[in-house]
Amino acid sequence: MIPLKYRSFYARAAAGLLCLSVLFSPWYGRFTVHAAEEQDILSACHAYQKRLSSVKKEADIAAYGFDIIENQVFSMTVKAFGDVSMIPAMDRTYHRLVLFFTDEDGNTVYSTDQLETNNQVRGELRQLNQGISAVSFQDLDGDDKMDILLITSCEKNDSAAGKAYKVGDVLFQNEHGFYRDWRLSDKINRFGMNKSIRFIESFLVDGYSTEFLYTASTLDELKEHGFAVAEELSSWRTFEKLGSLLVVPGTYRMAEYTVFMVYLVNEQGYIVWSFQPMGDYENLYTLKGVACRDIDGDGMKDLAVLARYSYEGKDGEMVLENDYSIYYQKTGGFYPDTELRKQYQSKDDSTMEELVETARAYWGWRQES
């Protein structure tokens, strides 16, 4: 994230770093890549960075292969450059998002593609970006400079909730432009606080966080942080491999969203296992049931959850969807179902009893009369 006068140096350095990230990503060493393929990757990295650094004016954006997201262009004041237009654009070839900043004469004074949304597929140029869901300009750190809150939409085949998910990010303004604190971006996305601008703001400004839902070791710790147990659905169950455990479904309210989790807690109050049935959904609308029964016929109790969730549609509308999760108890713990989901989708009027019987029938159980 370097100003215009250093751009040629930045382009060379960024190209090198991007290529290194591709060549030495965690998975890369698992595959044999021929020298010609390595050269192709290096050439692609350099070609992309050359196009990016060649954008000197707003008119160059489209000419060098970037499509401006017209409805997300905003004016703002940047201390280093004065009044500018923030122009987000999507690279046509690799679906990478770039933020260009231009002055009143249309000159590009700053640009960056160093965004969390461009790191969804580690070590690759091609990303999953589909567009921008929300942008907000706020002074988040109290230095009298406007920072940028950004939420993008990414899509891949194996995600739930319309096969799309959100990625949150924050760019803090400094004396030279903007910088990212990757630790904050990591927490925003790793702990599901990327659902809305208000959600991210609640974390960054108000100090609330969902992190404890994933790191707490006891039920008391969960409750101390505001986790609300669904007492009517909480009960003791004997799990063949884990012993007597309290099944604890519950919620945590942050901003305008309700986060849903299920825990298994032992007699000493320690969390033995946790489940995240929401997946990529944004909000729990209604919890319809939690059941502990042997579903796959191996003599061990499994866990089934049925709920109604909500998420934001492509046009900003709220979408409601019934969905279920089944976790099979095995020797090493619990494993989520992947087979039944290929054949059975719950309906708006589906019940927990119907779900359990359908799942048991799939595994060869005789229907109960």
Where do the PLM segments sit?
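Gram-positive cell-envelope targeting signals
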Residues: 1-37
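Beta-propeller-forming repeat regions
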Residues: 33-140, 145-295, 300-369
